[in-house]
């Protein structure tokens, strides 16, 4: 069964859960979030629909769990990438990693390309864990030495996340997101000042 700790991290996941989540991710990548259905996930995972519904009562619950698992992978990667960084360097790393994640992730790429409006809907619902992402960014900045008050740090993390999502979901011709040097330069010039020097 799914277990969430108080901080939103996933608890232990069984082999069946992993198989369902891996398959669900593939189905969401293939059909998009709106067109995907539990029947396809069950058939491809080799389990019954009732097995999925016992673990994930709705498609939104299943999608939320897939996204949360992606978030945990992102933040474990971010923790490694920002080890020994200053808060300013961490902003650059987080932005560059976030852009690369969306480019490399078939799931996020599918959403950005065919269902970008879902990011807006998800940010106002429990499905897309925008709070978890913002908290993770705040945690990373604090670990890297950010010394601003907690409330200010939470606001800064939220702003950084929303700016990054805006650029990723609605690309601009002012930034070539396929050019990592340009992405890092953009973050250093425009996002680092938000955290202060």
Regions found by a protein language model. Name each.
Residues 72-75, 119-147, 151-158:
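Amphipathic alpha-helical packing segments from all-alpha helical-bundle domains
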Residues 143-189:
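Hydrophobic/aromatic-rich alpha-helical bundle segments in the mid-to-C-terminal region
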Residues 19, 61, 73, 89-97, ...:
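Amphipathic alpha-helical interaction segments
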Residues 80, 112-120:
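Short linear capping/connector segments at secondary-structure termini
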């Amino acid at each position: 069964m799914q277990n969430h700790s108080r901080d939103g991290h996933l608890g232990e996941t069984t082999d069946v859960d992993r198989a369902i989540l891996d398959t669900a991710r593939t189905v969401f990548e293939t059909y998009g979030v709106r067109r995907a259905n539990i029947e396809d996930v069950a058939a491809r995972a080799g389990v019954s629909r009732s097995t999925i519904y016992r673990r994930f009562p709705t498609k939104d619950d299943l999608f939320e769990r897939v996204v949360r698992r992606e978030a945990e992978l992102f933040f474990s990667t971010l923790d490694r990438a920002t080890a020994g960084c200053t808060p300013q360097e961490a902003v650059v790393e987080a932005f560059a990693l976030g852009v690369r994640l969306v480019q490399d992730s078939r799931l996020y790429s599918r959403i950005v390309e065919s269902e970008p409006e879902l990011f807006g809907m998800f940010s106002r619902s429990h499905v897309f864990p925008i709070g978890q992402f913002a908290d993770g960014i705040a945690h990373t900045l604090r670990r890297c030495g950010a010394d601003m008050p907690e409330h200010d740090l939470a606001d800064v993390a939220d702003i950084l996340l929303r700016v990054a999502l805006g650029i990723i979901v609605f690309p601009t011709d002012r930034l070539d997101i396929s050019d990592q040097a340009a992405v890092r330069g953009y973050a250093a010039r425009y996002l680092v000042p938000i955290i202060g020097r």
